[in-house]
């Protein structure tokens, strides 16, 4: 009897795990359908390198932070 109960519980756990993984793959696939430029517009001015949600600097610019001055985008090599 314990074996049957164990088998049923194992099947239920396995099927729920498969469903969760399938939903996660579907969600990540939806994000990949749109290019990064459409998800987050770039900025030409102030930037925030410490936030993963902040948009990146445009083109060949980098985000530069100097002490207490707010961070800003500047062209590489200038």
Swiss-Prot record:
**Tissue-specific expression:** Expressed by the venom gland.
Q: Which cysteines are joined by disulfide bonds?
A: 42-58, 47-63, 57-73, 65-71
Which GO molecular function, any one, fits this protein according to its record?
toxin activity
Identification of the protein by name: RTX-VII
Q: Which GO terms describe its cellular component?
A: extracellular region
The UniProt comment on domains reads:
The presence of a 'disulfide through disulfide knot' structurally defines this protein as a knottin.
Q: Tell me the classification of the organism that encodes this protein.
A: Eukaryota, Metazoa, Ecdysozoa, Arthropoda, Chelicerata
Q: What is its main location?
A: secreted
Would the keyword Secreted be found if you checked this record's keyword annotation?
yes
Q: Which residues form the propeptide?
A: 23-40
